[in-house]
Structures are given as structure tokens and as C-alpha cells.
A protein has these predicted regions:
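Extended, well-ordered alpha-helical scaffold/bundle regions in very large, multi-domain proteins
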Residues: 193-216
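Long, highly charged low-complexity segments
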Residues: 1-35, 58, 65-76
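Active-site-proximal helix-loop-helix substrate-binding element of RNase H-like nuclease domains
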Residues: 37-40, 44-187, 197-199, 205
Length: 216
């Protein structure tokens, strides 16, 4: 758990990854449009900083919800790029908690599909392994989950934050590194215009998911 809240508002690129409690995601889809679930913690990575700020782990070690979310709002209010892997999920949850994001919202999952549309998997771990030679270390997380008798993928919120922090930070750091690779590939393949269109469409698609689409 970080001991301070750095001023990241002016960072040119900020990667963000949420840990959530989303109990019905497999049967009903993401819970954020109906607030079926919660943000458990926020991981942030910039050039020079990475931290995980836990707010709703069921077994303690949490930081003050309002202080963390006020800081998150300040962080995302700057003009820099905000980078997510599967942005509609994380941005949806941030929106559900009243967070308004300024600057470009970049989805590395979408960018990855543009760079290589023939992949079998667009998971962060798979992309990191194939393109960066890096994956998240999940050994300690799985050991802790085994001791607590929980599913490390679906029930992270049941673990104390100290077991989740490093894993969550790695998600944000890997997302930031992946974007550095994708930027050069988008330029090399000359698909900037397609990527820019996808990026501009994102807020529209998110609004449609949040409010629904009228069908006659």
C-alpha cells in the first residue's frame, strides 16, 4: 500500500487497472451499469510510479474510500492519455463511482486487435508474453488464494490488500508497457486513422452501454 498520493495530474500517460467485486459478471455481464458490485482497489502506473490503492477488500488493509477516489479524480482530470486494457470495463466502473476522465482514453485491447486481428487471445498476459516477453507473476497471489480457499481470478476482493497489491500494480505497469509497443506498431502499420476513430468512438459506445439503446 502506498504511503503517499503523488501528484500525477500532469503525467503524459497514465495506465489504470481496477480490481473489482463483480459477482454476476459471468451470467449478467459487467455490473457497473446497475452498480451490481464495487471497485475494490485502483492500480496506477506512470513513467516512474506504480501503486495500488485498496478501498474495499473484505479482509481489511483498506485506505479511506473518499481520500483515494478524490485523488483518482484529480489524477484523471489532467490532459494526458489514460490507458486501460479493456477500457469499457474499468472506465464503466469509474464512471459508476462518479469519476470523470479528461484526456484521451486509450484501450490497449482495441489497439492490439487493430495491430493483429488474427490472435486467439487478447488477454493482457498473453499480449505481454508474445510482444514484450513479460507476464504477471501470480505465484504469491495463487498461494495466498489457496490458503484463504478462494478463486484468485473471481474473488480477489476476499483477500487482504497486501496479497493483491503487487499483482494489481503489475497489471497497470504491463498495460503501460504494452501501449509503448502498440504506439510504434500503429505508426509502423500506418493505421493511426483507424485507431483514432476507434478512440473517438469509445465515449459514445460507453454511453450506449450505460443508458441502453432505444429499439423500435
Amino acid at each position: 500500500t502506498p504511503s503517499h498520493f503523488p501528484n500525477l495530474k500532469d503525467a503524459k500517460e497514465i495506465a489504470i487497472d481496477l480490481e473489482t467485486k463483480d459477482p454476476n459478471i459471468k451470467t449478467k455481464g459487467p455490473g457497473w451499469p446497475t452498480m451490481d458490485g464495487n471497485i475494490v482497489g485502483v492500480a496506477v502506473a506512470t513513467d516512474g510510479f506504480a501503486g495500488y490503492f485498496p478501498i474495499a477488500h473484505e479482509n481489511g488493509s483498506n485506505m479511506d474510500y473518499k481520500i483515494v477516489m478524490d485523488w483518482v479524480q484529480e489524477v484523471v482530470s489532467g490532459p494526458g492519455d489514460k490507458i486501460f486494457h479493456n477500457a469499457s470495463y474499468d472506465v464503466g466502473w469509474l464512471r459508476a463511482h462518479g469519476i470523470k476522465i479528461s484526456g484521451r482514453i486509450i484501450d490497449t485491447m482495441v489497439a492490439s486487435a487493430l495491430v493483429d486481428e488474427n490472435r486467439f487471445s487478447y488477454s493482457l498476459n498473453s499480449l505481454g508474453y508474445d510482444w514484450l516477453g513479460e507476464t504477471k507473476s501470480e505465484v504469491e497471489l495463487k498461494e495466498a488464494a489457496s490458503e484463504w480457499g478462494i478463486d484468485p481470478k473471481q474473488e480477489l476482493y476476499k483477500l487482504p490488500a497486501k496479497f493483491v497489491g503487487f499483482y494489481a500494480e503489475q497489471d497497470a505497469v504491463l498495460t503501460l508497457k504494452l501501449w509503448q509497443y502498440l504506439k510504434t506498431e500503429i505508426f509502423r502499420q500506418e493505421i493511426q486513422s483507424v485507431f483514432n476513430l476507434e478512440t473517438e468512438l469509445f465515449p459514445v459506445l460507453l454511453n450506449m452501454r450505460a443508458t441502453g439503446v432505444r429499439v423500435n
